[in-house]
Amino acid sequence: MVLNILLAIVGLIVGLGLGFVIAKSRHDKAINGAKISASSILENARKESETLKKEALLEAKEENQKYRSEIESELKESRLELKSQENRLIQREQTLDRKDDSLEKREGSLEEKEEKLGARQQLIDEREKEVENLINQQHQELERIASLSKEEAKSIIMKSTEEELNHELTLMVKESEQRAKEESDRKAKNLLSLAIQRCAADSVSETTVSVVTLPNDEMKGRIIGREGRNIRTLETLTGIDLIIDDTPEAVVLSGFDPIRREIARMTLEKLIQDGRIHPARIEEMVEKSRKEMDERIREYGEQAAFEVGAHTLHPDLIKILGRLRFRTSYGQNVLNHSIEVAKLAGVLAAELGEDVQLAKRAGLLHDIGKALDHEIEGSHVEIGAELAAKYKENSVVINAIASHHGDVEATSVISVLVAAADALSAARPGARSESLENYIRRLENLENISNSFEGVDSSFAVQAGREVRVMVKPEEISDLESVRLVRDIRKKIEDDLDYPGHIKVTVIRETRAVDYAK
């Protein structure tokens, strides 16, 4: 047992020794391998460092060479730029030298001129003194000869100069007015002639009577009735006078209201056709005729509105418009006149680029007040403007109605066009006529207005009152004053007279020289 233990211990010791020897041998081999590897690594590192060192030296040399080339190039460019600047400075110095020489020469010339101007100014001052002395001597001599002071002579010269300037100014104004008038007349004639060519209207004559044809003369007695009951009833209900005379188979209806006269005519024709004529039947027929008349008036208004393209008129305004069919002004039917004015205003508005439909509407309604002027207090212009405002018409239409006779200032081009179309429609030949009494009174007023001015010798109304010729006294009225006189007469006629169309005023100045040979 002990032996086994000893053997085990000996074996352990031997094993440990062998293990140590083997481990030491391996350790030595590892150390030698590491030394060899380290030597190899050091050698490789030395070689690589030498290679990197050489490459770095080469790169440094290349960079140095490149930098040196760039520096040399920049230096070369700087030298060239400096050389160029030096050349420019040399040229500028040369230019400045030349300018300096020129300025020196100019200064010398200016000094020389200054000396000459000084001498000339001195000479001028001396001559001015001489002239002033001569003028004073002449003034003294003139005052002695003319027995006038300097202020009196100055006043005479100023007055003469003022008269001469006024004369020239009047001539210039006259020439300017003539040129403007000729140009405006030419343009207006072209525009109005175009409008007239595109518009045609009927002419009618004013009448205050209507004639009803009878089938026979026996019907006259039936119309009169027993003790005149029928004729009195008809006259009372219609307000129209029935004239029954010796005219065969005819009865005359007389009255100044065309609507009532038309109702009476319609009633009488119905009674004649029916054959039953008595007061009750007359009342029935008058009422029926009035209803038919209201319908006809509405149709006339609608037809007029349709003809000019006014499609949105108020129904009440259409009825009032239709009443114009039975109104006349100086013999011209007012509804036809309104339609004509609407068409003319539309043509003029189209030529000037204005609203054609609005111009037609304003032209159609411009005399709407005449339908009610005998029922409502006020002028037809005021009534028409109030009606247009009441029925919410456009402000341009209201102003056109209010301003077409010049009572209110026109605020739009359409208002002016409506006034022009109204004057054109009224003034065309044959459009209007007037009674003999009014005609004679107008001629007398024309002559009286012309004769009221100082310097007028006589005046004559000619061309049916469309022209007044004024003869002036040549010793009191000069040619230039006659121009002012004709304007004054025209203004007074416009302010004092009411007339259709326009009136031409002609002032005639005549100077006669008479002598006798013996």
UniProtKB/Swiss-Prot annotation:
PROSITE patterns for this protein: HD, KH_TYPE_1
Function as written in the Swiss-Prot or TrEMBL entry:
Endoribonuclease that initiates mRNA decay.
Q: Where are the transmembrane segments?
A: 2-22
Q: Name one GO molecular function term.
A: RNA endonuclease activity
CDD domains found in the cross-reference section? HDc, KH-I_RNaseY
* Stored HAMAP family: RNase_Y (MF_00335)
- Bilayer topology: Single-pass membrane protein
Say which family it is in. Belongs to the RNase Y family.
Alphabetic keyword roster:
Cell membrane, Endonuclease, Hydrolase, Membrane, Nuclease, RNA-binding, Transmembrane, Transmembrane helix
User: What is the official name of this protein in its record?
Assistant: Ribonuclease Y
Query: Where is the HD domain positioned along the sequence?
Result: 334-427
| UniProt cross-references to InterPro entries, sorted A to Z | HD/PDEase_dom, HD_domain, HDIG_dom, KH_dom, KH_dom_type_1, KH_dom_type_1_sf, Ribonuclease_Y, RNase_Y_N
A GO BP entry is: mRNA catabolic process
This protein's source sits in the domain of life called Bacteria
Class in the EC hierarchy, top level:
hydrolase
As recorded in UniProt, its EC number(s) are 3.1.-.-
Q: Which residues form the KH domain?
A: 208-268
Span list, region Disordered: 91-119
Subcellular compartments: Cell membrane
Entry GO terms, CC: plasma membrane
